[in-house]
Every structure is written in structure tokens, then in C-alpha cells.
Design a protein with these regions (language model features):
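Cap/lid segment of the alpha/beta-hydrolase catalytic domain
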Residues: 18-141, 146-149, 157, 161
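Short loop/turn segments that connect beta-strands within beta-propeller blades
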Residues: 8-10
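Structural motif
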Residues: 2-6
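A conserved short beta-strand
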Residues: 164-170
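Proline-centered flexible-loop/turn and helix-kink motifs
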Residues: 1, 163-164
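Residues forming the Rossmann-fold NAD(P)(H) cofactor-binding site
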Residues: 152
């Protein structure tokens, strides 16, 4: 629903609208595909959105969120993302990692995670951090890794097995 309502025990009243009708597109996350090479030589793919606030720019490279989808064999696609837009409009970069095992890149890519979940996805988390730095897209000292469900498992494994690569995990 697009309304914030108030209930006084007898009547329901619209207190406010929760969505703006005229959001300036300059503040929305604008995804583009990036890729990097995994240790086994295969390409790994992600969707990168740079900071999107025309009235503010980070001094130097921006901090970044590195997002892992659930599944583990789901995938992230370019789309409107309120969550990504919230952070990119506040000066953060945003990367959604389609780690090896994600759908949409062919059978071999999808099967790469088979019997190696907790290894391949973690390699790709480290590769994502390295790619953001090497491609000049984010400050490698200000990276946050995040994910839910299977992505949360990747976050935990990465933080425990490779402390210091990411400054925080969600």
C-alpha cells in the first residue's frame, strides 16, 4: 500500500502517502554489468550501481555494499531497487554479485557451486572486493558485505574465513 494510516479504535484515517510520485531518476540506482576473473579462470558477474546523488559526491572512491542473493542458485537482475537506491543516493556504491552457481549464465556456471557451496561463493565474494578496488569503483577499506538466506550464509563464511576484507557484514 502507498498509505500510512492511523487507527483510533473506531476510524481509519490516511495520515500520509508513503511514496513520492515524482522521484527524480538521478537519485535512483542505475545498474550496469561488471565482471572479473575467478581463480579458476572463469568470469564472475555482478550488477554495479555507482552513487546516485547529483548534489553530493564522495571525496575519493565511495564506500560500497556488496550484496549476495539467496538461493543459492537464484540471481540478481537489473531492475528498480528501492534498497539499492536508498544507499546509492546517500553516496554508497552497490554491487549485487551473481556468484558462480547463479542462474542465467548457462549450465556450467550454474553447476559450479555443486558440492562446493561455501567455497566458490566465498571466492567470488573476495573477487568482488578485489574487482571493486582494481576497477576503481569503490574504496577497498570501506566495504560492507550483506545478504539474506543463502546469501547470509556466504556473508558469514566470508567474514569468518577472511576477516579484514570487509569492514562489516549484514
Amino acid at each position: 500500500s502507498d498509505r500510512i494510516v492511523r487507527w483510533d479504535g473506531e476510524r481509519l484515517q490516511i495520515a500520509a502517502r508513503s511514496t513520492a510520485e515524482n522521484v527524480d531518476p538521478a537519485y535512483l540506482a542505475d545498474f550496469r554489468t561488471i565482471s572479473w576473473t575467478a581463480p579458476d579462470g572463469s568470469q564472475v558477474f555482478g550488477l554495479y550501481a555507482p552513487p546516485s546523488n547529483p548534489r553530493w559526491q564522495s571525496p575519493g572512491l565511495p564506500p560500497a555494499f556488496v550484496q549476495f542473493h539467496g538461493g543459492p542458485t537464484s540471481a540478481s537482475w537489473a531492475r528498480f531497487s528501492a534498497e539499492a537506491s536508498y544507499f546509492t543516493s546517500r553516496g554508497y556504491a552497490w554491487l549485487e554479485v551473481n556468484y558462480r552457481g547463479s542462474s542465467g549464465y548457462g549450465r556450467a556456471y550454474r553447476n559450479a557451486l555443486r558440492e562446493r557451496w561455501g567455497e566458490i561463493d566465498v571466492e567470488d565474494a573476495l573477487g568482488a572486493a578485489q574487482a571493486l578496488a582494481q576497477q576503481g569503483l569503490a574504496d577497498p577499506t570501506r566495504l560492507v558485505i550483506r545478504g539474506g538466506s543463502a546469501g547470509g550464509y556466504t556473508v558469514l563464511n566470508t567474514l569468518v574465513r577472511h576477516p579484514g576484507v570487509f569492514k562489516a557484514g549484514v
